[in-house]
Amino acid sequence: MTSQDRSEAVLVLADGRIFKGESFGAEGATLGEAVFTTAMSGYQETMTDPSYHRQIVVATAPQIGNTGWNDEDGESHGDKIWVAGLVIRDLSTAVSNWRAKRSLEDEMREQNIVGISGVDTRAIVRHLRNFGSVAAGIFSGEAAKQPHDELIEIVKSQPSMAGADLASEVSTQEAYVVEPDGEALYTVVAYDMGIKTNTPRNFSRRGIRTVVVPANTPAEDIAQYNPDGVFVSNGPGDPATADVMVGIVQEILAQKIPFFGICFGNQILGRALGMNTYKMKFGHRGINVPVLNHLTGKIDITAQNHGFALEGTALEQFDTPFGPAHVTHTCLNDDTVEGVALVNGLAYSVQYHPEAAAGPHDANPLFDQFVELIQANKK
């Protein structure tokens, strides 16, 4: 499809900013929170990450679509696209990857995902950095022909991400098992708050049988699996609404079951230990974010995707009903809390994504740390 064949599209922000471009993917209208990712690769993993539910993603990479779409890199069940919409500067007209099965645009049309191209993504990102993530909408085709004042009102009418309880919308409805690659050494119950498929895969490589359960599954219900450890995954929405999961994690900590959390799981553990959360101005979304481990002094380059964070400071220590706890990791860009743990080591979590997909593997040994924790707890 040539530029002349594409219909008009507009990106409308709730604060009144409007960016005109061209439609790609499905035609129509979509609403969500406008956020940006600085990742230069891995758009398929980004778009299928359930943590992006109800978000319109602005890509800072100047051209998107070069590697097409394959059947291997999706991070959700059925390769479902979770982003509400995609905003890009330039759509690649050629697909160049030996694994590609179809183009990005073909997949977006198949899954009815609305996109806009030909916009100044640098200007959009500067606006979001200056004024923060904001409610937005993409309108294309006939939908783009409505008066701009009406489109702005439509965008303003959508629910805020602050206070949004979204985990139940992306979580599995039934428990399922991911078997290890070889002999099962241990069993881990993983709470699916929006889990990425690469997480159970990392457990499998380490001899872990992973039982993935729906969000908010009562702690007493997971006893039937006789778990050697409990994991809480990444996911979308405001952690301040996750009171049920906070209570569940507190029960698990009281039972002294080894615990590991990623992203949303980090915020849940923090809240279970008495910390508070807040909505960030524009969040962290990219695959090159530096994080300092204050326990080792080492720096990891990490993959991140979060718009909420825990309140706290580097090396802060505090008392909890489960023993002393401390802040273990912070972001070198802005000092955001990136990890917390019980001092006894029985529970720990990080805000970033050691499973990557896409991104660097610096933090992948955190999965080994969990296996070692389980081993030590069995003795």
UniProtKB/Swiss-Prot annotation:
Residue stretches in coiled coil: none
GO biological process, one term: glutamine metabolic process
Top-level taxon: Bacteria
Residues where L-glutamine binds: 51, 235, 237, 264, 267, 305, 307-308
GO molecular function: ATP binding; carbamoyl-phosphate synthase (glutamine-hydrolyzing) activity; glutaminase activity
Family the entry assigns: Belongs to the CarA family.
EC number(s) stated in the UniProt entry for this protein: 6.3.5.5
Complexes and interactors: Composed of two chains; the small (or glutamine) chain promotes the hydrolysis of glutamine to ammonia, which is used by the large (or ammonia) chain to synthesize carbamoyl phosphate. Tetramer of heterodimers (alpha,beta)4.
Annotated Glutamine amidotransferase type-1 domain residues: 185-379
Pathway the protein takes part in: Amino-acid biosynthesis; L-arginine biosynthesis; carbamoyl phosphate from bicarbonate: step 1/1; Pyrimidine metabolism; UMP biosynthesis via de novo pathway; (S)-dihydroorotate from bicarbonate: step 1/3
Short name of any one Pfam family annotated for the protein: GATase
Keywords assigned: Amino-acid biosynthesis, Arginine biosynthesis, ATP-binding, Glutamine amidotransferase, Ligase, Nucleotide-binding, Pyrimidine biosynthesis
Protein's UniProt keywords contain Nucleotide-binding: yes
Database matches in HAMAP family: CPSase_S_chain
This protein's record includes keyword Iron: no
Region (CPSase): 1-183
Catalytic residues in the record: 263, 353, 355
Stated name of the protein: Carbamoyl phosphate synthase small chain
Record field: catalytic activity: hydrogencarbonate + L-glutamine + 2 ATP + H2O = carbamoyl phosphate + L-glutamate + 2 ADP + phosphate + 2 H(+)
Role, per record: Small subunit of the glutamine-dependent carbamoyl phosphate synthetase (CPSase). CPSase catalyzes the formation of carbamoyl phosphate from the ammonia moiety of glutamine, carbonate, and phosphate donated by ATP, constituting the first step of 2 biosynthetic pathways, one leading to arginine and/or urea and the other to pyrimidine nucleotides. The small subunit (glutamine amidotransferase) binds and cleaves glutamine to supply the large subunit with the substrate ammonia.
UniProt-listed PROSITE patterns: GATASE_TYPE_1
Transmembrane segments: none
Annotated source species: Corynebacterium diphtheriae (strain ATCC 700971 / NCTC 13129 / Biotype gravis)
Top EC group: ligase
Stored SMART domains: CPSase_sm_chain
